Design a protein with these regions (language model features):
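Phosphate/nucleotide-binding beta-alpha loop and adjacent structural elements of enzyme active sites
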Residues: 1-299
Length: 299
């Protein structure tokens, strides 16, 4: 498991366990109470900010965003967040059962590495459609989005429609792998980290290789984003240099270390940088993960 990162990175990755604690401690005066309520899913929470301001936190996402000092530019009604940042069109996202990553996508803008303006991008692991919608409102000409979990796919479909982006985003129920075929997924599973291994529930979802996805489209994508909770290894490591060189930029959220992915991309003519791995025990997938980002630019 640790062979895909250095031993030093392995040791340092465990400090990430403290990140939520430190973030909440810096934001909330009564952070123990806030964290206790979050862990028990007891909302609303009567929070006291470090500046003395009292704030009623109605749900998890409001608590989460506030912990990053994000107090404005959004409104949450039930499970729908309306984002009204000055530099982008007003956007509404239904996050369902706390799915997607609204903070990273729309506020941290983790995908700003990808020059999406007037480009075509493949979004593997579209989740609730948050990343695909972000690419579209940042100027992408077309987004080809794949999501294998039916509940996430349904939310993504609704979010795309509610933001009037049906003509810019082509959404498919499916995943990416090292061979064409299918998997059986639990139709009730949702959220980041949900396993897509064989399940007792018999819902058949197609898998396609990256090369197949490229051949099935009548246009040439130039950008690739992968956040598929492990499929990045089968997808990238099995793809030929010819296939990968279709893309000028590739961004990957890796989940089990990065070294083999970095070596593969560099051998195919990409300049590659990575963020340090962070440790997480993903309860939904039942796995230990060392995750971070890979940024690859074709030379």
């Amino acid at each position: 498991m640790t062979a895909n990162i250095t031993f030093k990175e392995y040791l340092k990755s465990f400090f990430y366990i403290l990140e939520p604690f430190n973030r909440y401690r810096k934001t909330y005066e009564n952070f123990f109470h806030v964290m206790s309520c979050v862990s028990k899913q007891k909302f609303p929470i009567n929070a006291i900010l470090k500046n003395g301001e009292k704030k009623v936190l109605k749900n998890y996402y409001e608590t989460y965003l506030t912990s990053f000092q994000i107090m404005n530019d959004y409104r949450i009604d039930g499970t729908v967040i309306s984002i009204s940042k000055s530099d982008m069109p007003k956007t509404k996202i239904d996050f369902g059962n706390n799915n997607g990553d609204i903070y990273a996508v729309f506020f941290e803008e983790i995908y700003k590495f990808l020059p999406v303006q007037d480009q075509i991008i493949i979004d593997i692991g579209a989740n609730i459609g948050d990343s695909s919608i972000y690419f579209s409102i940042r100027g992408a000409k077309k987004v080809i989005a794949l999501e294998p979990l039916p509940k996430n796919h349904s939310l993504a479909e609704s979010n795309i429609k509610n933001n009037h982006l049906e003509n810019k985003i082509d959404l498919f129920l499916g995943g990416c792998s090292n061979s064409n075929g299918h998997i059986f997924v639990d139709p009730e599973k949702e959220g980041a980290g949900s396993s897509t291994n064989h399940s007792n529930q018999k819902l058949k979802v197609p898998l396609k290789t990256l090369d197949t996805i490229l051949k099935e489209n009548n246009f040439e994508p130039t950008l690739l984003k992968l956040d598929c909770e492990g499929c990045e290894y089968d997808t990238i490591l099995s793809s030929s240099e010819e296939t990968l060189k279709n893309f000028s930029h590739i961004q990957i959220e890796y989940h089990y270390g990065y070294k083999n992915l970095k070596q593969k991309l560099e051998s195919c003519g990409f300049d590659v940088s990575v963020t340090k791995p962070n440790f997480i025990r993903n309860k939904q997938a039942g796995k230990t993960m060392f995750f971070g980002y890979i940024f690859a630019k074709r030379l």
